[in-house]
Amino acid sequence: MCISVAGHHKQKAAINGFTAISWFSRFISFFKLILRPVVVWYNSVMAKYPIFLELDSRRTVVIGGGAVAVRKIQALLNAGARVVVVAERIDDMMTALCRGTDAELIKSKYSKNYLAGALLAIAATNNHELNKQIYKDCQELEVLCNVVDVPELCDFFVPAVVKRGNLQIAIGTEGQCPAYAGHTRKKLEAIFTEQHGEFLAELEKLRKQIIENVTDPADRKTVLGRLADDESFEYFTENGSAQWQTFAAEMIDNLQSARQ
């Protein structure tokens, strides 16, 4: 009898344990469900990936015909993109901007069909419902979308840029305050001059020579690091390109001599 009771208690304990585990599993599942929006929000905030895109001859679409659209079109044309402009009204400024370029002007209401084959699209209309529809269509077609001034409807943000030759510095605020990015750009424009772009062009030439002639990877890294530093730039600005090249050649020779 005692054995039977003990067995009964063990069975009951096992059932209770199973029930506890079951409830715990349900709690964990519920907890994950509650946290999912938080995780999605966290990823949306933290997972921005800065990138410079090669847009040469790639189809891009700008929807809208106002001043903002004009600025976006100009930037895309400067990057070599093949721009398709869709707007119900196309003014003389837009026509003049696109004249002599590969841009295609389509005077029409927006249609999802215009997005076909595009790498990215920019919605620059003053119609919020239309902008939302453009974003939705882009998601379905896997086209990167930027709805101007609506961060939550953006797959990417267009940064403020300081450009000196091929030196480009992009400043972004993830759509939180583009005006602050513009303010920061002005400060950087005062620091980085056209000479920085010229210096970069000389570095590019020399880098090719170093890759061909300096066989040791560690030596290449050392030389390029020294030639790209502030002291080297100051020498370049004070003495000019020809003397800087002599300075660079001596630095390479000294390093290689030290290795022998």
Residue ranges of predicted features:
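Positively charged N-terminal leader segments that act as targeting/secretion signals
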Residues: 11-22
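Hydrophobic, well-ordered beta-alpha structural blocks that scaffold small-molecule cofactor pockets
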Residues: 42-89, 94-97
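Residue-level detector of alpha-helix initiation sites
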Residues: 67-68, 129, 175
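Glycine-rich, highly charged phosphate/nucleotide-binding loops
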Residues: 99-116
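ADP-ribose/adenylate-binding Rossmann-like module
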Residues: 120-124, 131-157
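An accessory alpha-helical subdomain
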Residues: 175-260
